[in-house]
């Protein structure tokens, strides 16, 4: 055993590498065979040199390798460190011997194993322990030693080995099971592995699968028998001769040159290093997939990792375009739904189609909404396989995958895909290799159905011809060989088994597959259909369609109106188009159509095969079966012959018409020579106009109204359209005309002159006549034509034979006396029709009027025409504009084709929403007595007005809910409950009292006789109850209400909660309270909490106990008095909250009239103020006096008297002043705490005219009465009896509090707590 050591430190690969692992992760550069001895270089600690061991013989069992750091370049055995002296496990020895054998075999072949380089000393590189021979390695450097502890490294490796052994044992059973089904079940195994994201490299260049062995040997020795060139260009990219065709990114990276007989275990370990643990566990299964690839011929090319999108040639064929001849399709020709959601974890390794799946929109000829960002393939023409994949996807994919794409039928998709395919082939100069769409793309089931349909069509045509010949012979025998008359035809119904197919999906496919221009109901003589003219392309309808609508239609593959015909109405609406949009498209498109287009364009209308329903002889029952489709040929309308909605004309809807009585029609036969029978069934020539479809109803109406009206003005009565009216007589086969004798004395005289006059009538007049006949098929008397679902939608003037009154002139009942006006083109017919001649086809039914009444109704309709334009239709017609692409059920005729719709016009009107806030704001500025409507007061949240009709016109004693009328402005944010104040509202008249009633001045106290004693119940006069209330409820509650209103001393069961709620509601609607700052509101609530507590205690006392509410705490608390003054309330000795009405006269403001603006009581023009009396606990004999509200003492205007009153002692029975904790305030007596100079004007804000108010303006503590401007609240009067001034916490002292740091106003001194800069919110109002 020859061993050579390098100069660099040696790594003990026994410790760093696991059992026979080969690490080739970082083999970015292929080692050349010239590098047999590595150069002596000093690198970092991570750059290492490896010891290669070569066996002298091929006996692998004798080779036991010890690898470690060495200091001697000659003797390897002496250089082994202590860490490697222990015998290696058997697995390591076996792996090393196998690698040695591989290296020796390669050397004998002339191939030098490459020398892989290591990234670091900590990474496992078991491959490189066997690379190179002993003579190919340089001597080791004795100075550099491995720094890692061998014991620690050994323990770590042992733990890793144990873990890997456990995992291998768990996976060994799986590998054994997979080995059993390698050959027969290779495809299934491969699918499973691809689902696990397991991907391997390309097969070796041998191309043949090696024999499988239990030891996991991958390749035989013969696989490596190649020269340098073949190895370099092999599919595996193995660089022979050390030249390096191999790199770490090779598609066959799981193998190296020297592992010809290497077990699969090594590859599993390498895969663990390269990928993840899951791929490592599936290493053996990857070998099976590579073997199968080798059997299939393998991949050739650059040797990169095999991609599932690789083509058959060129290795990296993932970029090859779609549809290539060498394209290898994925096994799963289905779209990956996870890729669609952008969450496929397998990515390129997924077995389903990702990016290569063809885009539905692109290959159907639509505009892909995603554009360049589309997830699917755009580009070259599809192969037939991918075409079928896309067709299957559109048919079977669930709604979740299709998304917004509207599912279309297979046949429509084939047509669109073929058109797109031809365009792509032309653009790219490719050959169109697709099979015929009509035959090759149809399945066996479709082919069978097509054959059956063709056979049925031929059978029907033969039967039709026979029946026509019979009818012609019979007509010739009955009519003496004359030309058959219009009403002489006998028509057999079509075969019952030939009902129309599904109107939504399969009908167009059957027609396209048949290769005929018409449907299965069309004559064989009909030529191929012509597409719509190019001016009806959607690209030319930009004035009709918006960009959004155009995108919607392009999304469905619709580029012109012909394609829109093929799309069902429901699908158009699902695509986002509204009924208005669809109708507007068609209406404007037909308006834009040239007038001569209808005359020049001609195609064959599909004629109905009609048979007699009951009896071939119409003489027996007087009934005939008439084809109605020919009627519409007179309307100058030309349409495509391949109408996709022809199945709507295929129904067995034959109109049974009573032909009057049995008589001959010889006199009608001569006029018929000059005019074609409109109702006759023809094998029409190509010059006749085709039939309109349901889709083209508006064109019929527009031509009748627009083009027809111009034609009526330009053409004489005898002028007709020769291309459409008379061409079918010389061009058609006269033997196909069917006729039956019809008796005709008086019945046919008028009818013949109407229908077949000596001169041909104007086409529009005739079309109007036909339209009215067609309108109601259930009215058998109403005409001689059947009704199709696509033949009636006109608004022109007509002679209706049905009594269906509508506002429209074109849908009105007959007006016989107006015939001369309606039909100026019929000079022969008009005299023949007396004004009162009834219709000869009248047959009584439940829908019809009496003929006499019908005549009278026609006369009345002339007078009421304009009025009826705004009324609803009377015979259940649609009340809207006709929908242009409407497909109603044709089993009945109760739709727009038998009931002409009314034209409605929608006018958009903007109505301002009701703003109750503005109403409330406007109510604030009105005289509040004007708003007496209780409904408006409830809407605005105002209390209902009390009954002010007491004796002497005085204000009665108000109960707890007796809010003043003048308090409307303070109740603007809540809606009053109807049962909240029952005591007063039940006694309030429902109608508003006269507005002239004026409340008395508060300066006049109410008479004492109105005040009852405390414990004496006073009966109130009976008043009217609110009529809006339930009378039964009023009766039940009357005794209770009377008792509760009479007994004012009854205790409140809720314990004063009603009084508390009243005070709170007054707070919420008070502008003064709402404009206060947060701190001031807290202070007000704290003061009112004292009142609430006393009210609760008082009202919880027994009812029979004599009780008088103690108001002494209110009298002694000036802050409470000021709060009550601001709220205009006081609490009487019964514990009830009474509101003080404001002063109604205008010479001065009411109580605190200037209070909201910072002024004091008596603001404005110096109005009087109010000083509350001292309502401390009185002696018992004064209890009755204390029930009175506080007297309203009007203040004198003389400033001297005001000064005198302001400087006197305690006024009106107030207790003497008491000092607070800090003593008496500096500039005032006990009452004027914190009040500044009282003598000057302008001290109280806006109270300029009246002078100062005594007592320091006790009712406006928040108004700023210390020399500040209006709205200043710099110094609040003392709170309670503490004698402590209250500073404004929100605004700065002086200067209105608008700016920080304002100069001291009066005694404010600017010492406020909240010196908030820029506080422009003036809360002192």
Curated annotation (Swiss-Prot):
<feature type="compositionally biased region" description="Polar residues">
    <location>
        <begin position="594"/>
        <end position="606"/>
    </location>
</feature>
<dbReference type="GO" id="GO:0032785">
    <property type="term" value="P:negative regulation of DNA-templated transcription, elongation"/>
</dbReference>
<feature type="region of interest" description="Disordered">
    <location>
        <begin position="979"/>
        <end position="1058"/>
    </location>
</feature>
<dbReference type="InterPro" id="IPR045124">
    <property type="entry name" value="Su(sable)-like"/>
</dbReference>
<feature type="coiled-coil region">
    <location>
        <begin position="276"/>
        <end position="296"/>
    </location>
</feature>
<keyword id="KW-0804">Transcription</keyword>
<feature type="modified residue" description="Phosphoserine">
    <location>
        <position position="663"/>
    </location>
</feature>
<feature type="compositionally biased region" description="Pro residues">
    <location>
        <begin position="1003"/>
        <end position="1015"/>
    </location>
</feature>
<feature type="modified residue" description="Phosphothreonine">
    <location>
        <position position="604"/>
    </location>
</feature>
<feature type="compositionally biased region" description="Basic and acidic residues">
    <location>
        <begin position="159"/>
        <end position="178"/>
    </location>
</feature>
<keyword id="KW-0677">Repeat</keyword>
<keyword id="KW-0806">Transcription termination</keyword>
<feature type="compositionally biased region" description="Polar residues">
    <location>
        <begin position="710"/>
        <end position="726"/>
    </location>
</feature>
<feature type="compositionally biased region" description="Gly residues">
    <location>
        <begin position="1295"/>
        <end position="1309"/>
    </location>
</feature>
<feature type="zinc finger region" description="C3H1-type 2">
    <location>
        <begin position="358"/>
        <end position="381"/>
    </location>
</feature>
<dbReference type="InterPro" id="IPR036855">
    <property type="entry name" value="Znf_CCCH_sf"/>
</dbReference>
<keyword id="KW-0694">RNA-binding</keyword>
<feature type="compositionally biased region" description="Low complexity">
    <location>
        <begin position="1042"/>
        <end position="1056"/>
    </location>
</feature>
<dbReference type="GO" id="GO:0003723">
    <property type="term" value="F:RNA binding"/>
</dbReference>
<keyword id="KW-0805">Transcription regulation</keyword>
<dbReference type="GO" id="GO:0008270">
    <property type="term" value="F:zinc ion binding"/>
</dbReference>
<feature type="region of interest" description="Disordered">
    <location>
        <begin position="499"/>
        <end position="535"/>
    </location>
</feature>
<comment type="similarity">
    <text>Belongs to the suppressor of sable family.</text>
</comment>
<feature type="coiled-coil region">
    <location>
        <begin position="444"/>
        <end position="478"/>
    </location>
</feature>
<feature type="region of interest" description="Disordered">
    <location>
        <begin position="588"/>
        <end position="622"/>
    </location>
</feature>
<feature type="compositionally biased region" description="Gly residues">
    <location>
        <begin position="1149"/>
        <end position="1170"/>
    </location>
</feature>
<feature type="region of interest" description="Disordered">
    <location>
        <begin position="1143"/>
        <end position="1170"/>
    </location>
</feature>
<protein>
    <recommendedName>
        <fullName>Protein suppressor of sable</fullName>
    </recommendedName>
</protein>
<dbReference type="GO" id="GO:0071027">
    <property type="term" value="P:nuclear RNA surveillance"/>
</dbReference>
<keyword id="KW-0539">Nucleus</keyword>
<dbReference type="GO" id="GO:0005654">
    <property type="term" value="C:nucleoplasm"/>
</dbReference>
<dbReference type="GO" id="GO:0006353">
    <property type="term" value="P:DNA-templated transcription termination"/>
</dbReference>
<feature type="compositionally biased region" description="Gly residues">
    <location>
        <begin position="236"/>
        <end position="246"/>
    </location>
</feature>
<feature type="region of interest" description="Disordered">
    <location>
        <begin position="710"/>
        <end position="745"/>
    </location>
</feature>
<feature type="modified residue" description="Phosphoserine">
    <location>
        <position position="524"/>
    </location>
</feature>
<comment type="subunit">
    <text>Interacts with Wdr82.</text>
</comment>
<feature type="compositionally biased region" description="Acidic residues">
    <location>
        <begin position="9"/>
        <end position="30"/>
    </location>
</feature>
<feature type="region of interest" description="Disordered">
    <location>
        <begin position="74"/>
        <end position="326"/>
    </location>
</feature>
<feature type="compositionally biased region" description="Basic and acidic residues">
    <location>
        <begin position="1021"/>
        <end position="1033"/>
    </location>
</feature>
<feature type="region of interest" description="Disordered">
    <location>
        <begin position="1"/>
        <end position="36"/>
    </location>
</feature>
<feature type="region of interest" description="Highly charged">
    <location>
        <begin position="138"/>
        <end position="327"/>
    </location>
</feature>
<feature type="region of interest" description="Disordered">
    <location>
        <begin position="639"/>
        <end position="695"/>
    </location>
</feature>
């Amino acid at each position: 055993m020859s061993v050579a050591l390098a100069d660099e430190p040696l790594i003990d690969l026994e410790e760093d590498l696991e059992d026979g692992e080969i690490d080739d992760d970082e083999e970015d550069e292929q080692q050349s065979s010239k590098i047999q001895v590595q150069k002596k270089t000093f690198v970092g600690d991570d750059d290492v040199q490896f010891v290669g061991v070569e066996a002298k013989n091929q006996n692998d069992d004798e080779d036991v390798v010890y690898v470690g750091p060495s200091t001697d370049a000659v003797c390897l055995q002496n250089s082994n460190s202590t860490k490697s002296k222990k015998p290696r496990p058997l697995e390591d020895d076996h792996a090393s011997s196998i690698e040695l054998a591989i290296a020796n075999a390669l050397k004998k072949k002339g191939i030098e194993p490459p020398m892989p380089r290591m990234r670091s000393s900590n990474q496992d590189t078991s491959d490189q322990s066997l690379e190179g021979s002993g003579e190919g390695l340089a001597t080791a450097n004795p100075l550099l030693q491995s720094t890692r502890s061998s014991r620690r490294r050994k323990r770590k490796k042992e733990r890793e080995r144990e873990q890997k052994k456990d995992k291998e044992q768990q996976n060994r059973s799986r590998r054994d099971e997979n080995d059993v089904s390698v050959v027969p079940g290779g495809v299934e195994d491969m699918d499973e592995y691809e689902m696990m994201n397991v991907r391997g490299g390309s097969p070796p260049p041998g191309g043949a699968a090696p024999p499988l062995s239990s030891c996991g040997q991958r390749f035989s020795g013969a696989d490596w028998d190649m020269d340098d060139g073949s190895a370099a260009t092999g599919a595996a990219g193995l660089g022979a001769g050390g030249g390096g065709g191999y790199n770490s990114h090779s598609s066959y990276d799981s193998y190296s040159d020297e592992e010809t007989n290497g077990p699969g275990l090594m590859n599993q370990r390498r895969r663990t290093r390269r990928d993840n643990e899951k791929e490592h566990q599936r290493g053996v299964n990857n070998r099976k997939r590579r073997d199968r690839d080798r059997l299939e011929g393998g991949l050739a090319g650059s040797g990169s990792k095999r991609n599932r999108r690789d083509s058959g040639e060129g290795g990296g064929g993932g970029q090859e375009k779609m549809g290539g001849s060498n394209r290898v399709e994925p096994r799963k020709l289905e779209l990956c739904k996870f890729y669609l959601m952008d969450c496929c974890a397998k990515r390129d390794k997924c077995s389903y189609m990702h990016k290569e799946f063809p885009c539905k929109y692109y290959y159907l000829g639509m505009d892909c909404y995603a554009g360049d960002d589309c997830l699917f393939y755009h580009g070259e023409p599809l192969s037939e396989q991918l075409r079928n994949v896309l067709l299957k996807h559109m048919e079977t994919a669930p709604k979740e995958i299709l998304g917004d794409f509207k599912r279309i039928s297979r046949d429509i998709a084939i047509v669109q895909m073929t058109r797109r395919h031809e365009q792509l082939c032309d653009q790219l100069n490719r050959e169109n290799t697709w099979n015929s769409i009509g035959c090759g793309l149809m399945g066996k089931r479709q082919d069978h159905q097509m054959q059956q349909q063709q056979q049925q069509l031929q059978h029907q045509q033969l039967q039709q011809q026979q029946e026509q010949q019979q009818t012609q012979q019979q007509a010739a025998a009955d009519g003496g060989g004359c030309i058959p008359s219009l009403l002489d035809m006998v028509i057999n119904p079509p075969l019952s088994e030939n009902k129309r197919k599904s109107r939504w999906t399969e009908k167009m496919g059957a027609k396209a597959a048949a290769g005929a221009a018409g449907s299965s109901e069309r004559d064989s003589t009909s030529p191929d259909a012509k597409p719509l003219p190019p001016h009806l392309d959607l690209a030319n309808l930009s004035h009709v369609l918006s960009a959004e609508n155009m995108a919607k239609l392009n999304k469905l593959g619709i580029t012109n109106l012909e394609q829109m015909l093929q799309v069902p109405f429901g699908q158009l609406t699902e695509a986002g188009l509204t009924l208005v949009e669809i109708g507007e498209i068609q209406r404007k498109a037909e308006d834009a159509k040239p007038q001569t287009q209808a005359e020049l364009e001609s195609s064959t209308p599909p004629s109905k095969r009609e048979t007699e329903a009951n009896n071939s002889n119409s003489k027996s029952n007087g009934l005939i079966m008439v084809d109605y489709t020919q009627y519409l040929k007179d309307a100058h309308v030309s349409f495509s012959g391949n109408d996709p909605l022809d199945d709507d004309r295929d129904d067995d809807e034959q109109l049974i018409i009573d032909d009057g009585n049995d008589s001959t029609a010889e006199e009608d036969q001569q006029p018929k020579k000059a005019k074609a029978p409109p109702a006759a069934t023809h094998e029409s020539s190509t010059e006749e106009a085709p039939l309109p479809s349901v889709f083209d109803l508006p064109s019929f109406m527009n031509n009748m109204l627009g083009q027809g009206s111009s034609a009526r003005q330009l053409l004489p009565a005898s002028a007709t359209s020769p291309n459409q009216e008379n061409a079918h007589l010389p061009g058609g086969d006269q033997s196909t005309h069917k006729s039956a004798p019809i008796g005709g004395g008086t019945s046919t005289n008028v009818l013949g002159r109407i229908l077949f006059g000596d001169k041909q009538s104007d086409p529009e007049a005739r079309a109007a006549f036909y339209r009215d006949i067609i309108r109601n098929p259930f009215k058998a008397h109403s005409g001689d034509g059947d009704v199709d679902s696509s033949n009636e939608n006109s608004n022109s003037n007509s002679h209706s034979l049905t009594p269906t009154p509508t506002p429209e002139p074109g849908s009105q009942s007959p007006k016989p006396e107006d015939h001369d006006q309606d039909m100026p083109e019929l000079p022969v017919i008009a005299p023949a029709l007396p004004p009162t001649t009834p219709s000869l086809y009248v047959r009584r039914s439940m829908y019809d009027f009496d003929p006499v009444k019908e005549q009278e109704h026609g006369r009345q309709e002339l007078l009421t025409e304009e009025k009826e334009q705004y009324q609803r239709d009377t015979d259940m017609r649609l009340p809207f504009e006709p929908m242009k692409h409407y497909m109603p059920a044709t089993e009945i005729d109760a739709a727009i084709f038998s009931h002409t719709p009314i034209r409605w016009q929608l006018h958009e009107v903007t109505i301002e929403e009701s703003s109750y806030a503005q109403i409330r704001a406007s109510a604030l500025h009105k005289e509040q007595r004007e708003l007496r409507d209780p409904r408006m007061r409830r809407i605005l949240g105002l209390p209902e007005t009390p009954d002010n009709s007491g004796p002497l016109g005085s204000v009665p004693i108000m109960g707890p809910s007796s809010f003043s009328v003048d308090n409307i402005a303070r109740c603007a944010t809540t809606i009053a409950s109807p049962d909240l104040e029952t005591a007063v509202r039940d006694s309030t008249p429902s109608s508003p009292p006269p507005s002239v009633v004026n409340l008395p001045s508060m300066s006049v106290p109410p008479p004492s006789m109105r005040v009852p004693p405390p414990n004496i119940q006073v009966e109130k006069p009976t008043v009217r109850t609110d009529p809006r209330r339930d009378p039964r409820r009023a009766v039940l509650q009357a005794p209770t209400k009377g008792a509760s209103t009479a007994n004012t001393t009854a205790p409140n069961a809720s314990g004063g909660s009603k009084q508390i709620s009243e005070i709170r509601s007054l707070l919420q609607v008070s502008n003064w309270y709402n404009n206060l700052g947060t701190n001031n509101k807290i202070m007000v609530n704290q003061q009112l909490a004292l009142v609430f507590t006393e009210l609760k205690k008082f009202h919880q006392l027994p009812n029979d106990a004599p009780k008088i509410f103690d108001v002494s705490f209110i009298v002694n608390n000036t802050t409470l008095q000021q709060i009550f003054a601001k709220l205009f309330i006081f609490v009487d000795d019964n514990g009830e909250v009474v509101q003080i009405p404001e002063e109604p006269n205008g010479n001065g403001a009411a109580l605190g009239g200037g209070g909201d603006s910072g002024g004091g009581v008596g603001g404005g023009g110096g109005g009087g103020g109010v000083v509350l009396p001292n309502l401390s606990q009185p002696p018992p004999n004064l209890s009755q006096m204390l029930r009175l509200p506080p007297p309203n003492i009007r203040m004198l205007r003389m400033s001297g008297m005001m000064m005198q009153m302001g400087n006197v002692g305690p006024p009106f029975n107030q207790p003497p002043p008491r000092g607070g904790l800090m003593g008496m305030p500096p500039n005032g007596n006990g009452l004027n705490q914190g009040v500044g100079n009282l003598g000057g004007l302008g001290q109280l804000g806006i109270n300029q005219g009246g002078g100062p108010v005594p007592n320091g303006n006790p009712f406006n503590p928040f108004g700023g009465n210390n020399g500040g401007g209006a709205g200043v609240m710099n110094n609040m009067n003392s709170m309670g009896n503490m004698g402590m001034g209250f500073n404004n916490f929100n605004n700065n002292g002086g200067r209105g509090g608008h700016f920080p740091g304002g100069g001291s106003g009066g005694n404010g001194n600017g010492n406020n707590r909240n010196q908030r800069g820029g506080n422009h919110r003036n809360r002192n109002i």
